[in-house]
């Protein structure tokens, strides 16, 4: 489905939420934000997901990342449901705001509509979409899951770490990368530039092609 994707500026929508009116760009400010949708309040997978989000809030806070949820349910429904979420996982307090989009206009603009899932009135429900939005208000990364598959919070944290490392050091992260492991030098950086930029040195993989495009280094 066409719509908001990596590199696009997130729409500056204003919606009611469990924390009052929220304008998305003001909420982002100069931080990273995880903007995520869920299909519906008082549903099983969503309850486990939002409880997990609450449990990981400290990890995101350490990284300067804020959480912002959205679904088509109204604010009172969100507030009532939060009681269930916190009872399901005692100690995981839902301190992040959840926006309400009963008209479904916001989820359309945010590219969060699930074409296969509908409510009892035939209205499309949100997918399990998640956009990581940067301080420049642009989408840096997106996950899109169907209603039947819950998200992996460890992977969301890893993706945040990878994005922030890449932005800070102008590098890329290889498959299954975790903080502290080697990163790769982008192909647009020459060896001479790499020597200047990465005085700690770098290793070039010895490949049959003889091309020196796979270069690893360590960053702090």
UniProtKB/Swiss-Prot annotation:
PROSITE patterns: THIOREDOXIN_2. The keyword Magnesium does not apply. Induction: By abscisic acid (ABA) and oxidative stress. The keyword Nucleus applies. It catalyses: a hydroperoxide + [thioredoxin]-dithiol = an alcohol + [thioredoxin]-disulfide + H2O. Thiol-specific peroxidase that catalyzes the reduction of hydrogen peroxide and organic hydroperoxides to water and alcohols, respectively. Seems to contribute to the inhibition of germination during stress. Belongs to the peroxiredoxin family. Prx6 subfamily. This is 1-Cys peroxiredoxin A.
């Amino acid at each position: 489905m066409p719509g908001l994707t990596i590199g696009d500026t997130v729409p500056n929508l204003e919606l009611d939420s469990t924390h009052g009116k929220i304008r998305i760009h003001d909420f982002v400010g100069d931080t990273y934000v995880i903007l995520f949708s869920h299909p519906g309040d008082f549903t099983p997978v969503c309850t486990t997901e939002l409880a997990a989000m609450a449990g990981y809030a400290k990890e995101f806070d350490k990284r300067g990342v804020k959480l912002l949820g959205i679904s088509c349910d109204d604010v009172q429904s969100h507030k009532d449901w939060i009681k269930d979420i916190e009872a399901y996982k005692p100690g995981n307090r839902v301190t992040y705001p959840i926006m309400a989009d009963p008209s479904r206009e916001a989820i359309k603009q945010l590219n969060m509509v699930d074409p296969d899932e509908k409510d009892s009135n035939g209205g499309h429900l949100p997918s399990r979409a998640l956009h990581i939005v940067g301080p420049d208000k642009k989408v840096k990364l997106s996950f899109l899951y169907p209603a039947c598959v819950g998200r992996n919070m460890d992977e969301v944290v890893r993706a945040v770490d990878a994005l922030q490392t890449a932005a800070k050091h102008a590098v890329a992260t290889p498959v299954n990368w975790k903080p502290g492991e080697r990163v790769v030098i982008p192909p647009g950086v020459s060896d001479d530039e790499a020597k200047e930029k990465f005085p700690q040195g770098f290793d070039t993989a010895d490949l049959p092609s003889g091309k020196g495009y796979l270069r690893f280094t360590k960053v702090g």
